[in-house]
Amino acid sequence: MTLIARFVLIGALILVPSAGTAEQIFLTPRDFLAETFEGEIPKPRVLWIKGELKVAIADILGHKPVGLRIRYWGRGSKTAWILEEIGKYMPITAAFVVDRGQIRRVSVLVYRESIGWEIRYPFFTEQFLGVSLSADRRLSRTP
C-alpha cells in the first residue's frame, strides 16, 4: 500500500463517524409524556435556575447546570422531567417521573454514545425507582 493510500485510509477512519455513535431514539419526548400522563399531556412549566437553586443543582450534579431554566410537566403530585446530560463524550436525553418526591420511572429517550448502551434497559433504570433526595441533597440510597 502506498504512503498516500495509507494516509487516505487513516483519514477516513478518523474523520468518518462510526455507526456505533449514531443517535439512537428509543422514545420521543412526546411519547414519553403521553405514556406518563395517560394521553393528556399537561402544559409545560418552567423552573428557573438561579440563586440558591443554582448552587444546590451544582452541588447535586457536581458541575454548574447548563442553561437558565428546565422545562417540566406536572399534574397533581406527579412531575415529568426531560433532561440532557453528557455521558462519557456525548449528550444523553433521559426522562424521569417523580411522584411525592420519589423517582417512579426512568427512561433513556435518546442515546448518542458508542459505549454504555445498556443503560437504556430496565435492569439498569429500575435501580433508581423509589429513590428520593435526602435533606443533605444526596440520593436516599445508592442505586
Regions found by a protein language model. Give the residues of each.
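Positively charged n-region of N-terminal signal peptides that target proteins for export
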Residues: 1-7
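Flexible, solvent-exposed loop/hinge segments and secondary-structure transition points
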Residues: 21-142
